[in-house]
Amino acid sequence: MHGMVLDISKRKMSKSDGNSTTPAEVIERHGRDSLRYLLAKLSKGEDFAFDEKEMSDVSRIFMMVNNIDAFIRQLPTQDKKMKSFAAEDRWIISKYHKLIKEVTQAYNSYRFTEVINLFEQFLVFDLSRTYIQFIRERSNEVAPLLKEIQMGLLSFLAPITPFISEKFWQRLKLDGEVDESSVHLSTFPESNIKKRNENLEKSFETVI
């Protein structure tokens, strides 16, 4: 549940005041999933100010998801398992399994704002700006790991952005990467404590 949606001046939206925007109008301009994502990000069970300009931030996140998908799709698909793991691989695996645990806990407590914050932190900083930069010269080697993470991220997004998540899942289905006919029929990832390495996570903080 969320509180009252206010305008950018934190006043109650009202047609008579001319400061109201209907969900239908926002959806027509930006799409259903964009509105769902922004409301999940902003709503903490309290009143909040709605600024449509923040939709540009949502668009940037969706564009990053699209760019990562394009990067992963051009990688080879023949190897389903990695033969060896470098330090950066073990680091992203640890961060990913930490993310699974925290996102699961947040969903179970209906803390959707926290789900979005955790997702963005991992997507932007851990995956895009750090890990992918580390592995660009050996990206073919880590294709199975990247594809596993991508499937997990789509599962995380699916309850909030069902249409966009399904679009990317169907691309995976077309490429023969997944068996489930829909992301909404897939198994939610489970965190494995044996794949966590907190010391490695801390050591990477000093590097990045």
Language-model region placement:
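Extended, hydrophobic alpha-helical segments in both membrane/secreted and soluble proteins
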Residues: M1-H2, S9-K12, P23, S34-L35, ...
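Conserved beta-strand -> loop -> alpha-helix junction used to position metal-binding or nucleic-acid-contacting
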Residues: H2-V5, S186-T187
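Generic structural signal for hydrophobic core residues of well-folded globular domains
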Residues: H30, L38-L42, I68-L75, F119, ...
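Core structural elements
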Residues: R60-R73, A87-L99, I116-E137
